[in-house]
Amino acid sequence: MAKMHTKRKGKSSSTRPNRTEPPEWCKIGADEVTTITLDLWKQGVSTSEIGMILRDRYGVPDAKLVTGKKITTILKENNVAPNLPEDLTNLIVKALGLRKHLSTNKKDVHNKRALNLTESKIRRLVKYYKQEKVLPRDWFYKPETAEMMITR
């Protein structure tokens, strides 16, 4: 769960059902899900968007239930996985946008705070990914070189 940077309590959301096998009405097979996933990835669709497309267009409630593997695992097995996790990439893109905004609007204190909070999230996430050995031990976030990391 993410750190709350506010006094509010957050909002409730629904929980996913406890299932170990796909529902009977899901007629698509594991091979089809794998090929669809790889095709969508080649078109430039992110992993979270692949999951939503599988859900909305193909009626697959959860790719892991059908294939037994997560979408990123499918991509890793086919040697096309991204070098950075998607949530970290999204936070870095957000921080880059805030930095660009602050370069022209130097007195925008609210977005200075937003940048500070976003970069704190990035540092916490990097620390987690280093512990889980997703990122190498010598990897660290530098705002100056962040744009080059994202475009690679």
Swiss-Prot record:
* Annotated SMART domains: Ribosomal_S13_N, Ribosomal_S15
Question: What superkingdom heads the lineage?
Answer: Archaea
Entry GO CC:
cytosolic small ribosomal subunit
Keywords linked to the UniProt accession = Ribonucleoprotein, Ribosomal protein
**Where is composition skewed (Basic residues) in this entry?**
1-11
- How does this chain assemble? Part of the 30S ribosomal subunit.
Q: Which family does it belong to?
A: Belongs to the universal ribosomal protein uS15 family.
Q: Identify the HAMAP family for this entry.
A: Ribosomal_uS15_A
Name of the molecule in the record: Small ribosomal subunit protein uS15
Tell me which species this is from: Methanosarcina mazei (strain ATCC BAA-159 / DSM 3647 / Goe1 / Go1 / JCM 11833 / OCM 88) (Methanosarcina frisia)
Name of the coding gene: rps15
